[in-house]
Amino acid sequence: EFRRVLFRSVAGTVGLMMAKILKVSSKNSLKAAIDLGIAMQLTNIARDVIEDGKRNRSYINSNFESIIKTLKLADSFYESSFKSIKEIPLNSRFGILVARRVYREIGNKILNKKNMDNYKNSGKIYVSNFGKINQTLLSVFDLIKLVFTKQSEHLRKDEHSIINEQINLNERI
């Protein structure tokens, strides 16, 4: 429980700081920023298992099942961040959608490796320039989809009750 709260607080704080920089004030959007920060950090952890192992760092077990589990968790955080992106100021919204898609695509590329041997032999996994262009174009559809998406209660509200005890969403930075 402590590790979970610590991880979510640290990873979520990165998203929260970005939200404050972008002048996001909606509580739902701040929660989405926390979720997006967590999703991106989980993706980094899954991507860097081999590199971290060489440096005697271990955030998850170094087997493909743990990587899959981590990426599925990341995916749930990417999903929960989407609807509240609608409340982010328009001038920042598209960039956030692109970053969300590009990072999520890193996870998809990892999953496409299918097993640990392929993962180990692939080197650093990243999204190519063409892939980034593709994800940018797909983000246009996300932007349009947001116009027709109704704002609803945040998907991970129960988990945020733990985070809310640690982070004051009304605090000024």
Regions found by a protein language model. Give the residues of each.
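Catalytic cores of Mg2+-dependent Asp-rich isoprenoid enzymes
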Residues: 3-40, 46, 50-173
